[in-house]
């Protein structure tokens, strides 16, 4: 009987370790973040840089508001600008992190959104762009991770590129299931850190979000 209860306690601790989170690109107030926190969501990932080539000031404020609500795991993501008129890869990271610092707040992890949108066909150039972003983040002492999946990675840098496999992976796959069971390894990652399991939906407290899960 004693062993039975120990087994139950261990099972419960594993289940309770799983965490729910959201990523957002619309304005959310501190009070709404408090509602989201109370609804059981423990990590937040606002967008802090637009693919159009500018800092997402709404996202930076979301970082600040989320922390003011008592959330401690607050990240940010960059949707890079790939046009010839855009700032360099390093300067996009610099602008994002400088904006976060200027707002008097911080992010836990900077995620680089690597998905098919305006990326050139040149894998070598794309790899260099990503490497420059990662290097700039590390120069700031900022923890950095990659947002991508098998098909995006294949098209943008090629499946033989494992250059960022030491970083955490945020994996989008809208299968409606909060687990890693359908994950297919790519880019040197044996498993992801986060699963984005639902595309944009009305989430906690009426906010439009993508739903995420950490086991």
Swiss-Prot record:
Alphabetic keyword roster: Antimicrobial, Bacteriolytic enzyme, Glycosidase, Hydrolase, Immunity, Innate immunity, Signal
Record's note on what induces expression: Induced by Gram-positive bacterium S.aureus infection. Down-regulated by exposure to Gram-positive bacterium B.thuringiensis spore toxins.
UniProt keyword annotation of Hydrolase present: yes
Observed effect of gene inactivation: Reduced survival in response to bacterium B.thuringiensis infection. Simultaneous RNAi-mediated knockdown of ilys-2 results in a reduction in survival following bacterium S.aureus infection.
Superkingdom, natural source: Eukaryota
Domain Ch-type lysozyme: 18-215
Leader sequence residues: 1-17
GO biological process, one term: defense response to Gram-positive bacterium
A Pfam family: Glyco_hydro_25
Location of the active site: 23, 113, 115
Family designation: Belongs to the glycosyl hydrolase 25 family.
The protein's name in its UniProt record: Lysozyme-like protein 5
